[in-house]
Structures are given as structure tokens and as C-alpha cells.
Amino acid sequence: MEEVTAVGQPAEYLESLLDYLACPLDNSVPLSVARNAAGKVVALRSGDAEYQVVHNVPCLVPRLEEGARGALPRWQAHQKKMWQEYKDGDEGVFAAEGNDIGRRVGEIIARSAEGLYLDVGCGALARPVYMAASSGRVEWIGVDPFFGDTVRQFPFAQGLGEYLPFLPEVFDGALYAGTIYHHLDPRRSLRRAHSVLKPMGKLFVWCTARRLGRKYLIWRGLRALGFARMYNEDHQWAFTRKSLRTQLERAGFAVEDQVFLCEACPDLASCDHKNEYLTIAHRM
């Protein structure tokens, strides 16, 4: 998917992942481990499929199924754009240390949850600000299609949200930090997230809520007619507060709260900034 650099992760991070990893195409199937003569993990296997382990990072991106191939070039172009922006020093799409809303998200998670959490679309930062803000209460594992060139400070697997490569009922919680609308198929990703969470496991979705205006309605109508097109140059999908809630409920989650994250405005009606929300739910 990208040129892999010499940067990976410590061997102990990989070893900590092995008990949780599964076939991305069928996550009820655990992966078998292939080691070299020195005992180093070099590949993970499921049936006839073999997935590389590169510099202690399991590379678990499957071949996309036929139905997803039409959107693949657009998806690849978007991923390449974000990756290049990061390499050029623009961390705008990532929750870096100076991201106040990201820090608030981490604090909310720390107050309401604990245990082992999955960051779905963790990006390429060594440690996103919400991870730092929730440390002590939450232990993080990250998954992202980007291999990256940064040594992450948490266990990491290269993978897709639609094909989360983890066994069922492993995680106490999961977070989509501004990533749900980047997926080719967010519905599929949410269903897989439901699978990897323990019963009553927490789900946090941080995203920009769209207003029910002309642009959104036109885009939604085109989607309904079968025209696969992005909402804008950065987002494959768009959600209002209500439509996101509907998608979560259809995936088997019960929504507990939707927290308005703008620190400058008292409510959505008076806000002219990005309308960012943190939706809090749990697996039913």
C-alpha cells in the first residue's frame, strides 16, 4: 500500500498483539505464527493467506473484495494525500499535542472507561494527544492502513477498519478519532468494531457533524441513487448527529450521549465553527 520504511515497532509490542490478532477476512479465525530459526516472527497465516510481518509490524491489509474495487483508486489517492501532508510536517489531520479537542476527548474517555482500547485509524503520530490524556486508565492498541515512518508508542497493526484483524470480544472499548467518514464502508467497519468489543464494551466516535443543509441532502441523494462519490475532497462520507446515531444503532450499539466539543460556543445552533461531537455508545 505504501513504501515501507525501516521504522517499525519493538518486538515486545508485536508479541503483545499475537494473542489478539485474527484473519482480517474472517475474524473468528486466529492467525498462526511463522518464526525464523532465531525465533523472530516473520509472517502470520490463515488458510492459504500469508501476511507479512515487517519490522515487527503485522501487515494485515487483505485484498479488497470485488464490491470495493470501484472506490479503491479514490481511496488510495486520499490516503496518499494525508500521508504526504504528514511527511511534509502538516499534522492537521492528526490529533497532535496542541489539539485541545483531542485532549478533551482523551479526558472524557479516561473519566468514563478503562481497560484495553482499540484506536480505529490511529494515524502516524507516535502518541496522539487523546492517548496521552487517557493514560493510566486506558491501554491502547492502534490499527491504520498507514505503516508510517514513526516509532509508535503503542502496539500497532497495519489494517483496515472494514476488516479489523482482531478476534471477537477482545477490547473493552474502541475509538474512531475523526476517521469514521474516511472509510470505504463505515457500516461494515462499525459491525466489525461491534464484533471485537466485549459485551457492553464502550464505543467513542469523534467526528464533525454535518448540518441538514442543501449540500448534505444532494450528496445523500446521489449516494442513494448509487453514485459512489465523496462528500468533499477529504471525506468519503458525511453524517449528521441523527444519521450517525442511526448507523450506530443498526450496528448493534446503544447511544448513551453525544457531547458537543466546541469550546467557544454554548451549543450547535450558535456555532459557526466545525461542529465536532463525541458520540458515546456501548455494545448491546
Residue ranges and their predicted role:
Residues 226-243:
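Acceptor-substrate binding/catalytic loop of class I
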Residues 55, 61-112, 130, 147, 203-227:
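Conserved class I S-adenosyl-L-methionine
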Residues 116-163:
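Class I SAM-dependent methyltransferase SAM/SAH-binding core
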Residues 187-199:
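A short glycine-rich, Lys/Arg-flanked "PGG" loop and its adjoining helix->strand segment in the class I
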Residues 162-174:
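A short acidic, Gly/Pro-enriched loop at the edge of an enzyme's catalytic core
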Residues 173-185:
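A short SAM/SAH-binding and catalytic strip from SAM-dependent methyltransferases
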Residues 2-74:
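N-terminal auxiliary segments of SAM/dcSAM-dependent transferases
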